[in-house]
Amino acid sequence: GYDTSFYDQSGVALLKKDDNKLGGLYQHAETRLEESPIIGELSIKNAADLPEFTGFDRYLYASGGARVEGAELTATLIEASGFEKVEGLVTLSPLDNGTYEINGQTFDKVILSCGAWLGQTLEPLGFEVDVRPQKGQLRDYFFEGMDTGRLPVLMPEGELDVIPFAGGKISVGASHENDQGFDLTVDGTVLASLEEEAKTYFPDLS
């Protein structure tokens, strides 16, 4: 077996700026249950059930919502696949017999899962795709003695999420920056903006 502690089905609380629209969101989620039973049980609850959070009166709760440490998930999937992992820049060249050459090796089929690099991978082959990098910044906070592990993920309407983890950790974000390319430089202005928005829902960040 594999360690799956990076995944925790903590539930999710979804918010609407107009909470009268929660009923419609509930009905939409219900229609998805048959094909996605992992959504879990659905209910509209009062904010009093989540005293740690503020800024709303009601929320839609889905018990199947979960938080995940993405890097650990990726590493586990790669390990479980049993495939050889080769790190580095690759080039893809189609051959006349319908196969593909990648860095000196030949393959019958190729699955491209290169995310934001898809465009530059396909460009030499004459393809254009509307795929671009999007920079996403998160900010982590740690609260000593706070039982954050029992809290659900909070998803207000918009781009911000408040993601509690066990051990007093709270993550807020992410930013969705379409004009930064592959620049991974931390932008303090963006992080300050995320914090200010998150305080609406989790005042303990102050």
Show where each model-derived region lies:
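A conserved short coil-to-beta-strand element within the FAD-binding core of flavoproteins
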Residues: 84-101
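A structural motif corresponding to the C-terminal end of an alpha-helix
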Residues: 80-84, 201
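Glycine-rich nucleotide phosphate-binding loop and flanking beta-alpha elements
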Residues: 21-22, 68, 92, 117-120, ...
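Short beta-strand to alpha-helix junction loop
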Residues: 17-23, 60-79, 185-190
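Active-site substrate-recognition segment that forms the wall
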Residues: 3-8, 114-206
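Dinucleotide-binding Rossmann-like beta1-alpha1 core, especially the glycine-rich loop
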Residues: 1-52, 56
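Core beta-strand elements of the Rossmann-like FAD/NAD(P) dinucleotide-binding domain
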Residues: 103-109
